[in-house]
Amino acid sequence: MKFLVAVDGSDASHRALDYARELAEAADASLTIVHSVDPTVYAESSPEPVSDLAEADRLYVAERVEESERRGAEILDGARGRVTDGGVDVSTSLLYGDPVVAVSDFAEENGFDAIIVGHHGVSARTEAAFGSVAKGLVSRARVPVTVVR
């Protein structure tokens, strides 16, 4: 079996990761940990992406993406360190795009048996404006999704 756990560095994603490790150990399954970097730029409190950016803004966005990639790599490294002591086969992957789309597509394309995700992530403001990743995964994913509180 193959389990996919989506993390964002929050306490909720740590709980999901701990649960996923226990589940993988019990099922003799592999565990892939993912984090999604979304390079899309949104206007404040709007679900619509900004399509027209000045060149200076494009450079700023590129810097923000690089910063997000570094942060994503740190989150994945920390998550891997949290689960490597249990004897589970663990891999990580940094994804790009909207987390709901990126994670659900990755799960389907790579034949995962289930997705495990925390109930609430790091950004309550973003969640209020756009909806939670967990809720989106439950709606969109074609494999079972376990939401950990």
Regions of interest found by a model, annotated:
Residues 1-2, 149:
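Absolute protein N-terminus
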Residues 2-55:
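Small/aliphatic-rich secondary-structure junction motif
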Residues 32, 91, 146:
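Conserved beta-strand positions in the Rossmann-like core of class I SAM-dependent methyltransferases
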Residues 35-36, 118-120, 149:
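Short secondary-structure boundary segments
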Residues 48-52, 109-111, 133-135:
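Short, hinge-like loop/turn segments at secondary-structure boundaries
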Residues 53-74:
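A short acidic, glycine-rich active-site loop
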Residues 78-115:
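Structural beta-alpha unit
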